[in-house]
Amino acid sequence: NTGWNLEDNESNQIWVSGFVVRNPSPITSNWRATSDLEEELKRQNIVAISGVDTRALTRHLRDRGAMRVGIFSGEDLSREEMVIEVRKFEQMTGSFLAKDVSTEKSYVVNPKETRFKVVALDLGIKAATPRSFAERGVEVTVVPFDTTAAEISALKPDGVFLSNGPGDPATMDSVVATVRELLSDEVPIFGICFGHQILGRALGFETYKLQFGHRGINQPVLDKLTGKVEITAHNHGFA
């Protein structure tokens, strides 16, 4: 019920194909809101449905794993025909999505005072990420996913950041090759989420699709150095 505003957007558009909610709030209750969720979904032509037992849906996915799904209206199609339509959609395994979400042109996010310079390879980067770097004195040059190692090195960065993003890391052979070339040049590289998996593949590791994706803000992770369990936020379907 917090509504919608342009300041908090992590991207210039909604990327999900559909939205499911049990009980949508009939009111928007936040002083920063400039529109409501329903209005924004309509503006961006995102299919949405309410009145769904999302708890039962969650239990179903918990027991059977992530799966393709469709949202249908009307009675033109039978249940069997709906299933056929859903199965036409591409599975996440083998999906190459970086080209759809990456920036087309490079751009720079400047800090008040520059301590370091980092090149961020945009595999689906969130808007808050370069802003967070800038708040810490890091000048960030965000570049398209298909930027070459030579083009990155020409910017003379102190490090290269591999962003988060959607899709199957096993499809990113060209980006993996770029990262390997940068590693051979001893350029410091770090990544999160999808970018972390790309870095792993560049170092010779394999990735695979999880039957149950890790989603949520309360995922426990054991730090083997300290023996302590940290509560972390996860949102990934591959490991």
Predicted regions located by residue number:
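Generic structural signal for residues positioned in beta-strands
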Residues: 18-20, 70, 100, 206, ...
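Short Gly/Pro-enriched loop/turn and capping motifs at secondary-structure junctions
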Residues: 126, 237-239
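Generic "edge-of-domain/loop-turn" microfeature
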Residues: 26, 76, 228-229, 239
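Cysteine-nucleophile active-site neighborhood
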Residues: 154, 159, 163-237
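RNA-binding accessory domains that recognize and position tRNA/RNA substrates
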Residues: 1-150, 154-155, 169
